């Protein structure tokens, strides 16, 4: 056995409570290296009792590792345990202290321990997220519902955008399209920032308590949220707490008064008088973006101000959560306080961080509920849009993502294929709709929350920002109805099948450009098969007999467990 690959730690994601009496544990081994794994466990203070023994199940395999899992049923809230690992010949006992050829006895402090399951150690996402499908709106480009609040020099709707061009999108425009959103089938919207700012994107906030007048006002925001709620749609606002805008009152006071300003310590000022060029004389977003001075969230006064903002909009207009911009550049201490404030104001509010990389430090149950899942997007773009990786590599990428987090976190990850900060998926796929449809099937059948960037559902294209922020296409003759109807079908399939919302995930086939997996829940299963190639493929899969394709994207020919897959095809077998 390759001992160097065998790994466990009594912490997330290798050990975590599902409730006060169940502990999920995971053991990693080298791929194809082990044939049996058992866990031996008992209550930590049951000095005379015997160890219980339980076999573990191989749940995930990738190019490097196998992962074995089980759930321990506990009589008490504390447990200690160790593993028995076998490759058919050699047997090893694996403990926190290392490996043993003989079963260790009287080894209390050498075993793996989960000392106590506290009530707050159990992570539960907001209940409504289990059936959630999110639609992101960039308000300035979604719909112009009130021309009376348009900015000066507004551009004609549909003209190609620049970094600073305005088109007049507003909150009334979103209200006017609630029926459209309801017809599509989504049940949550996330709005990029809507607070006072001079920019089109509003990520340089001037006033956190004022809706930008080109979008509307507080009453209009309240109306939007209420009408969304009336139609079964949750509303998530965007919080930009890493930095403010150059015109933010506190920064302007520093510009005017220097060290005499009571807000001096709200920022990290290198030199005064303030300079913006050639490089800002203060810490700013991305080091050089002078319009966005970084806020010092270690400062108790800054914390108090921002936490009051977060609470205010929940209470004032009844929003259902916050998406947190540049969340990975703010200290964890602040986010723990943020969670306490938000959950006290509205326990079912969702907290979603913007983290482009491994977000596990923020997803332990004490900070965020979810993040925008850019690693998911990376894998989907590479496999489906660009076709530059194999199914085996794709499986490794998504398996690694699943194994970073608790199951309850994976189920609420915002699985996006594009956003206001990325190229449109259809652009990356060189306009090949077939590739996009395959990606969508995976997105809507994988573990997590499907996330739609406005306009993707009608076939919008666009390169990197600002081109990805084009005006929404409302002329039906210009919309791709094939893509739109495909979205609607996938949304319906996901909503009607519990396996896709709650089920476990297991890869069944990952060879060449064919990928197949199973979602299973309460004894029922759905098998998804994706042929991400331009030629017919023939594969053998167990468990497919008796199952019918509910997607009906392309004809499926079969002979027992042999499947004849059409080029660029997907099948959802139930």
Swiss-Prot record:
Binding site for substrate: 243, 323, 420-421, 465, 469
Record site feature (Transition state stabilizer), residues: 421
Pfam short name (any one): Alpha-amylase_N
Record bears the keyword Metal-binding: yes
Co-factor requirement: Ca(2+)
Keyword tags: Calcium, Glycosidase, Hydrolase, Metal-binding
Record's keyword annotation contains Magnesium: no
Enzyme Commission number(s): 3.2.1.54
Catalytic reactions on record: cyclomaltodextrin + H2O = linear maltodextrin
Top-level taxon in the UniProt lineage: Bacteria
InterPro entries: Glyco_hydro_13_cat_dom, Glyco_hydro_13_lg-like_dom, Glyco_hydro_b, Glycoside_hydrolase_SF, Ig-like_fold, Ig_E-set, O16G_dom_2
GO biological process, any: carbohydrate metabolic process
Effect of residue 325 to N: Loss of activity
PANTHER family per record: ALPHA-AMYLASE FAMILY MEMBER (PTHR10357), MALTODEXTRIN GLUCOSIDASE (PTHR10357:SF210)
Subunit structure: Monomer.
Its job: Hydrolyzes cyclodextrins. Can also act on linear maltodextrins, with the exception of maltose.
Protein name (Swiss-Prot/TrEMBL): Cyclomaltodextrinase
